[in-house]
Amino acid sequence: MKIRVELINGNEHRTSSTPQQPQQNPSVSHIFDGETAVKDHIKVLLTHFKIPVDKVSSYALQNPFTLAYVEDSFLTPERLVEAEKSYFILRMKPHAIADRVVDQLTKIEPTSPHIKDTIFNIRYQMKDVEYVEEFIIKGGINQLLAVIIKSRGNTQSYALTALRCFMGYNSGLEEVMSRPQLIDKLYSLVCSVGVLPSVCRQAIELLFCVCNFDGFQLVHRSAKNHAQETSTPAYSNLITLLSSGDMETQLNTLTLFNCLLDNAPNPRKSEKLLSRWQQLGIIKILKSQEHVTHSDFRTQIARFQANSGFGIDGSGRKRTLTRQLSTQELEFQLHQFREQQPLISLLTSELKFLRNAIKSAIENGSYINYRAPTERYDEYSQRKLEMIGDSPTNLQFLKRNDKFTNAFRKSMYVRSPNTSDLFDSSTLEDTYDGNNDTNSCTSISTSSTPIHISQPTTLIVPSTTPNHPPQQSQQTPPLQLQKEKEKEKEKEKEKEKEKEKEQQQQQQQSNKQSTPKPNLSCLLSPITISNTLNNNNNNNNNTNNNIIKSNNNNNNNNCTIKDLSPIVKSEKSNEDEIHEISLNGASSNHEEPIKYKLQPTKSPITPSKRMKPLHWTRILNSQFEGKKTIWNSYLPEVTFEEELFVDLFSLYTERIVSFSGSPVGSGTSISGGGPIKSKPIQKVISVLSQKRSNAIIVMCGKLPSDDILIRAIRNLDSNKLSLDGVSSIISNFPTSEELASIHELHSNEVILDKPERWCLMIDGFPMIKHRLRCWEFMLKIEDSLKSIIESIDTVLLACKELRTSITINCLFSLLLQLGNYLNGGHLYRGQSDGFNLESLSKMIEIKDNSNSGSLLDFAIKTLYQQSPMKGNSNTSIHLELAHVPNASLINFTDVGTSVSKLLQDYSEIVLMSDEIQQTTDKDDPFLDIVPKFMGTILLILKNLQTKFLETEKYLFETIDYFNPTNQTLQQYQQQQYQQYQQQQFQQNIINNNNNNNNNNSNNNNNNISGNTTTTTTTTTTTTTGSIINNNNNNNNNNNNSNNNIINNNNSQSNLQSLLHPQYYLSNSSSSSSSSYKITPPLSSSLSITSQEWNQQKFTCEKFFTLFSTITTAFKKSPSKRLSQKGFGLKISNSDDPMAVIIEALKTGSPNDMVKRAF
């Protein structure tokens, strides 16, 4: 059978499938014959997908719908016919994917850019439990932890996400919990400076997950160890995060504190933690968060309030973070009650619908759906108080809901022959009167009394007046039940006649003995079988029925049949009585005893607040008269503090913060002192835009406190303030306009917002912007120099390798011979002594007659067959040209631009440093650090410039060595200088036009000190701008360098010589006058706009990329190269019929395949 097979190599999530562009994986149509083993099929498929056959044990065939692996037993003709309609999946097994991922994490450095893709793929591969287990067994979590600690940025965030996913499995959680050092490193990651907010959030989330799973000691131990290492108080860094600008970080941090309090081993430990956090200022920070309206954050604050408390007096503990409910909170509760009215209306409509459904079911005589509403409303009745709360008082329909619930319960136990007897007519009414419910009489509950139904039971309900018989149901029983009932009556008819006279005598005696009763509310049974009752005169004929004896002397106290209900609570509990009726199926010879409702002996209590309910079973002493119990014996009176008890167990928890704009009640102060004194409200004013304010708030959350920040800037302490912090301060530094607006509004009557206060603070430090620029240059220049030097060294070594490579010489010699042979007899192309480098691309494009290889492939194959290349490894050229692939990625033009930028930055920093030295005091550490550093950097930059120029010259000579031209290096330098002058002239024109459009009134203030006219041999251009002003007193123009103006100081003569390489100035002379020509910045000499030069010259990237392509062509092994069709070797083997079939399917010519096989 021919079945399509798709390859999924573990990265199927990369391609997103859409209806317009469905997911497309590599696929092939493969023939399954049912006799070949699955392993052999996988080998053939791996060969097709160009995967090494030795990895056959790592792959398996899978059914895409059942996800079951295809075994040999599956390859039956019937199943193959079914599979032909769908397809199979060829994918790596989970243990193989785990081996590959762990191996990549082990071999690749955590700081490598390739590790990011590997970590990103992990969470998509965790859908298989087998993969997760294999990953954990092979130590993948250890490698993941190394990535978390050593990596930065998104890689670190992806690694934390993967670790969080592994903790979702039991084995992963146990692995994390069994390694305390992992928790220590996670805690140190949270407290480190310069970590991304997303990384910090995920690390905190992992910590409180560990804490919730019995990991309190692990997290607490990590906090103490970190405090000992950093010599700081425990949890101080976490409390600092509560005031950060990132809301998610604040929320996770507060959640961690709540988890620590919830999982503390004992109350004493919780009190110690709360005391320590209070000293660190957590209460002050939480108080400052009153303006936060985030619902989750407010919930966590309320949770922290419920867990925390500090003693105000010696009698007990009382919360210090609670406040009384304000008027707005009460309005909010009222608003919630109003919002519940639609729900109540909906439930009322649903109840009416259920009544009609029940009525319809009773009429049909079926019990099909009697359980569904019972279970639903049982669950609802348990939660109705929580759902509605203090709802409007007229909720009688909920009481009727209880009636229906109990009625349905009775239907589960009482299987009466007549279904309609389960309900009376009043229960099935569509409408009801709430006032009548309050005045309705209570019925006798028989739920606690056993009901015997061996014989049909009926209840005779006495009439309310002599002229009105009891109401009868209009329902008729089924025929079968009616026949059975008649048969039973006939059998009992004879016995009834004999006992008829005796029962009449007993009834007369009982009526005589009955006395009038006080005002009572009757409780009638919910089971009323009215179909069998014709009138009260026929009661003597039914001797086997239970009789309800009622006193009719007082008509005003009797109940009407209309108000019958299963359960109704009496309004007047002092006047209620309960009648016990036993339904035993036999006539009673004695009158049933009457029990009055038990009355409590204790006086009622009215709490000051609504308290939490305590669900218990009440015991009244009147139930056990004459029996000695602990409750009717003497119990001592014990007093308790009512106010404290109400605060601790009231139903509503007072909030730590009030709603925005709501008045604060007169509670206790946040520190536990006396009442809060009202202060005049001062308006908080924000001057900056919302975007600027948010950026400054986020930045302040990552920076240390103000005093530590100022001290670090003065001392240039990189341990307290990193490069990221310095750069963020410079990027968010307030402008002069913003500072002027802030100073204008700053007064004692106005409170500025936090970003404005930070701007005033940072502006108060003298020359702080120049100082930050100097410090940033000192921190960045080391990495910049390292990157530039590595690029220069790579290009220099690559040039030397090309000049000394034996393989390249042999290859070029062979290509020259082959080219002359191809062009033999041609007048202009033949008899060549060499060829241009661009000809190599044409040699790659020329294919042989079988279209299986190029001219370059043939030359490389021939080199392997020659004696000089025989026996050499196919990686010999990679050893000879080891640096060429890396050099092909380097843009030497950008390297020159970077060197030029370093020199320009150095000149600006020197001027700024001189200004700071003239204005600062003698004890400033700046005077000892910066001048010495700048002197050292000057020597390094000189050496860097020399090395760059030498490498550029050598690169020019190497390119000219392989691709000779008639142009000299001096001509090339002159063209480069002319190109720079043209670009500078165009840039100055654009800048002048922009200045004129922006401000026409300031047309003369363009900071241009002079014009320079440069005449060359080819063109004459006028260059405006870029003039060095030698005026030592003109220091105000440093901030207005729009036209590349460099304000030079005569004391920087060494810097002048550094900025002006002599090879750029063909006609330059010593600058003895007051003004001289500014030289262009250093740039690579390999980007020329001359058309003739570009036709012959190669850029650095293009030149080395060409040779990198040649090295890549050598990667193909000789065996694979010689197995191509053009060299007479067959692909398939006649001994393997499956390979012959696959080759026939590929080529479409089975006859040719058979010929080639034989």
UniProtKB/Swiss-Prot annotation:
GO biological process: actin filament bundle assembly; cortical actin cytoskeleton organization; culmination involved in sorocarp development; gene expression; sorocarp spore cell differentiation
Domain of life: Eukaryota
Record InterPro entries: ARM-like (IPR011989), ARM-type_fold (IPR016024), FH2_Formin (IPR015425), FH2_Formin_sf (IPR042201), FH3_FHOD1-3-like (IPR056771), ForC_N (IPR049497), GBD/FH3_dom (IPR014768)
Domain DAD per the UniProt entry, residue ranges: 1134-1158
Domain GBD/FH3: 20-388
Disruption phenotype: Null cells grow normally during the vegetative phase and, when starved, migrate normally and form tight aggregates. Subsequently, however, null cells make aberrant fruiting bodies with short stalks and sori that remain unlifted. Aggregates are also unable to migrate as slugs, suggesting it is involved in mediating cell movement during multicellular stages of Dictyostelium development.
Segments of this protein annotated with the region Disordered: 8-29, 417-523, 990-1052
SUPFAM superfamilies: ARM repeat, Formin homology 2 domain (FH2 domain)
Biased amino acid composition, Low complexity: 438-481
GO function terms (MF aspect): actin filament binding
Keywords associated with the record: Actin-binding, Coiled coil, Cytoplasm, Cytoskeleton
Gene Ontology CC terms: cell-cell junction; cytoplasm; cytoskeleton; cytosol; macropinosome
Residue ranges of domain FH2 in the record: 601-998
Domain notes: The DAD domain regulates activation via by an autoinhibitory interaction with the GBD/FH3 domain. This autoinhibition is released upon competitive binding of an activated GTPase. The release of DAD allows the FH2 domain to then nucleate and elongate nonbranched actin filaments.
Quaternary structure, from the entry: Interacts (via GBD/FH3 domain) with activated Rho-GTPases.
Family: Belongs to the formin homology family. Diaphanous subfamily.
Protein role: Formins play an important role in the nucleation of actin and the formation of linear actin filaments.
The protein's name: Formin-C
